[in-house]
Regions:
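N-proximal helix/coil linker or "cap" segments that precede and/or mark the start of modular domains
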Residues: 1-12
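Short loop/turn microsegments at loop-to-beta-strand junctions
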Residues: 10-11, 32-33, 120-122
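A short beta-strand-turn-helix
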Residues: 14-32
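Thiol-/selenol-based redox modules, centered on thioredoxin-like
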Residues: 120-152
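Structural microenvironment flanking redox-active thiols in thiol-disulfide oxidoreductases
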Residues: 47-90
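Conserved small/polar residues in nucleotide/adenosyl-binding loops
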Residues: 43, 150-156
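Short, internal strand/loop/helix patches
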Residues: 68, 79-120
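Short active-site neighborhood of thiol/selenol oxidoreductases, capturing the structured segment around
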Residues: 28-44
Length: 160
């Protein structure tokens, strides 16, 4: 499967959700979708990012937008993460990295001199027709969610 590109339709994909149901991208047509990728459940930055999406969830819903998070954590880990922080949205368990590879977010990282492959914190805005309209890579957690939803007020999104 080819990688997503801004301005192009996102290919249909399926993935395992936290509730062990299957997320089907094709079933989300008709509403905007924010997909955010984060490295790991229950870590400080990832928790803060999830809390920011949670705290802005009602604003996003009013803009006809659904939120979904993605990491390589298991569905069981996601269930605990959601319960602990009261997230009103689902998380995709991408242990096989298929969704991560589709969105090209697996990158070489460096921690304390040790190189490894991991998720680069990234967010993607997909319009109601399934077209990728904006991507943010190497995201800084603070203030990122507000920047994400300001793009939803652009005429190209609101007129869809």
């Amino acid at each position: 499967m080819s990688k997503v590109q801004v301005g192009k339709k996102v290919p249909d994909f399926r993935a395992l959700l936290d509730n062990e149901e299957t997320f089907k991208f094709s079933e989300n047509k008709g509403k905007n979708l924010v997909i955010y990728f984060y490295p790991k459940d229950n870590t400080p930055g990832c928790t803060k990012e999830g809390e920011d999406f949670r705290d802005n969830y009602n604003v996003l819903k009013k803009l006809n937008t659904e939120v979904i998070g993605v990491s390589k954590d298991s569905a069981a880990s996601h269930q605990k993460f959601i319960a602990k922080f009261n997230f009103p949205f689902n998380l995709i368990s991408d242990e096989d990295e298929k969704v991560c590879n589709l969105f090209d977010v697996i990158k070489e990282k460096n921690m304390y001199g040790r190189k490894y492959m991991g998720i680069e914190r990234s967010t993607f805005l997909i319009d109601a027709n399934g077209k990728l309209v904006k991507e943010w890579r190497k995201v800084r957690v603070k203030g990122h969610v507000a920047v994400s939803y300001t793009h939803l007020t652009l005429p190209t999104i609101c007129s869809v």
